């Protein structure tokens, strides 16, 4: 299998080969971030936004477990872990008014308009829906970024935080594959970041075909697709080498 090696990774001399599609890719831990997308109660829990909006969240447990494995491997290898939290102030000023397409397309906002008793509860900062799930709580060395739209690059400090740390590779896990994961990976591609999605550590909003379509888009046009075990194996190996050096 061919392996993609960016010139900056080759210069670093610390790259490890990650098995991926359509070809393997070499990643240096110090140039890589694990992006944990929106693992909030809103997107994983019964009674959260996605569930109340009519999306199936009953199969998210294996995804949560795979993300935990990826986070553990990232921490051990010295890979920067970044958590996203999607949402707005509790008055929804940040969500945009009727002049914003977000007002008309956000399923959270539409659900609250249909069910006024939910107003102020869905994706509102300070509320249960907005908070990260208990199984995925950040460590002191992790970064948490709140974002007001699907892409983590929009109206956040993500780009400057990455560039200041010399990070050029982004490995994505989280929810939803076809919305915030793909949106951020695409924007990263346009900003010259190398994006990898871990297939079995992402979950879609909607039918599983949406997940498959996003993975096809990513590996064909915008980046690479790997899996949790390959990521863990690659960077556990990296850690073992460091211990024996």
Curated annotation (Swiss-Prot):
Which SUPFAM superfamilies would you find in this protein's record?
Answer: Isochorismatase-like hydrolases
Q: According to the UniProt entry, what is the EC number of this protein?
A: 3.5.1.110
Protein family = Belongs to the isochorismatase family. RutB subfamily.
Corresponding gene? rutB
Enumerate the InterPro entries for this protein. Isochorismatase-like_dom (IPR000868), Isochorismatase-like_hydrls (IPR050272), Isochorismatase-like_sf (IPR036380), RutB (IPR019916)
* Function recorded in the entry: Hydrolyzes ureidoacrylate to form aminoacrylate and carbamate. The carbamate hydrolyzes spontaneously, thereby releasing one of the nitrogen atoms of the pyrimidine ring as ammonia and one of its carbon atoms as CO2.
Question: Which pairs of positions does the record mark as disulfide bonds?
Answer: none
Task: Kindly provide the name given to this protein in its UniProt entry.
Answer: Ureidoacrylate amidohydrolase RutB
Give UniProt keywords alphabetically. Answer: Hydrolase
The organism's lineage is:
Bacteria, Pseudomonadati, Pseudomonadota, Gammaproteobacteria, Moraxellales
Enzyme class comes to hydrolase
Report the active site residues.
38 (proton acceptor), 147, 180 (nucleophile)
Identify one Pfam family in the record: Isochorismatase
- Reactions catalysed, as given in the entry: (Z)-3-ureidoacrylate + H2O + H(+) = (Z)-3-aminoacrylate + NH4(+) + CO2; (Z)-3-ureidoacrylate + H2O = (Z)-3-aminoacrylate + carbamate + H(+); (Z)-2-methylureidoacrylate + H2O + H(+) = (Z)-2-methylaminoacrylate + NH4(+) + CO2
Hydrolase as UniProt keyword: yes
| Top-level taxon | Bacteria
GO MF terms held by the record? hydrolase activity, acting on carbon-nitrogen (but not peptide) bonds, in linear amides
Its Gene Ontology biological processes?
A: nitrogen utilization; uracil catabolic process
Q: Which HAMAP family does the protein's record reference? A: RutB
């Amino acid at each position: 299998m061919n392996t993609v090696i960016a010139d900056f990774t080759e210069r670093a001399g610390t790259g490890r080969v990650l098995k991926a599609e359509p070809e393997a890719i070499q990643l240096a831990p110090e140039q890589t971030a694990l992006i944990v997308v929106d693992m909030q109660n809103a997107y994983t829990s019964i009674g959260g936004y996605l569930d109340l909006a009519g999306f199936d969240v009953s199969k998210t447990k294996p995804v949560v477990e795979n993300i935990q494995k990826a986070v553990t491997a990232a921490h051990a290898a010295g890979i920067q872990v970044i958590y996203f939290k999607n949402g707005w102030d509790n008055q929804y000023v940040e969500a945009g008014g009727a002049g914003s397409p977000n007002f008309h397309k956000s399923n959270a906002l539409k659900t609250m308009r249909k069910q006024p008793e939910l107003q102020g509860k869905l994706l509102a900062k300070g509320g249960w829906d907005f908070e990260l799930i208990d199984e995925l709580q950040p460590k002191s060395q992790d970064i948490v970024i709140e974002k007001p739209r699907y892409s983590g690059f929009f109206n956040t400090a993500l780009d400057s935080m990455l560039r200041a740390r010399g990070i050029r590779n982004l490995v994505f896990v989280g929810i939803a594959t076809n919305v915030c994961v793909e949106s951020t990976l695409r924007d990263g591609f346009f900003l010259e970041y190398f994006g990898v999605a871990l297939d079995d550590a992402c979950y879609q909003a909607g039918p599983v075909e949406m997940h498959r379509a996003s993975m096809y888009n990513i590996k064909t046009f915008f980046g690479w697709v790997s899996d949790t075990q390959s990521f863990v194996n690659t960077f556990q190996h990296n850690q073992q080498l460091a211990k024996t050096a």
